[in-house]
Amino acid sequence: MPEAFVPLTDFVNESKSTPRDHPLDKPVAKWVEEEVLDGEIVEAGVVILRTRGCYWSIKEGCSMCGYFNDTVPGGVSDDMLREQWKKVRPTLRGKKYAKIYTSGSFIDPTEVPFEFADEIMSDMSDMGIEKVLIESLPEFVNSKHFAYTNAPK
């Protein structure tokens, strides 16, 4: 690593080691914005679930973004993820499009357990959501991470 980057990496790693007092049962954020779906402008529900965050940031001390500030070292329990989901459902209800972010990778099973992801995909399908955009690093994109029981098409 070039010497000029060492102080930045050290700063980022030190910042990540400082505990933050985040409510584990509340998402980072939720809002509604316009999006295009099949050539039509629709309302999209956007949510950022609080998780342990990006494994690359944890593993290598990545300094590309500051999203680690919204994460929880050690992760969030399945029960707390479900509590967060209860709080974001009203933002998604009645929408055709959903965007799910985690400040990491939604389909990294060590960040978001597959069982939880499967539950919420089914819930979004039941709500009538037609399209879901998720955040992920490319190394997690494979068929086993998309083997949901019931998901929007």
What would you call each of these model-derived segments?
Residues 147:
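Catalytic cores of alpha/beta
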Residues 34-39, 89-90:
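Short boundary motifs at domain starts and secondary-structure transition points
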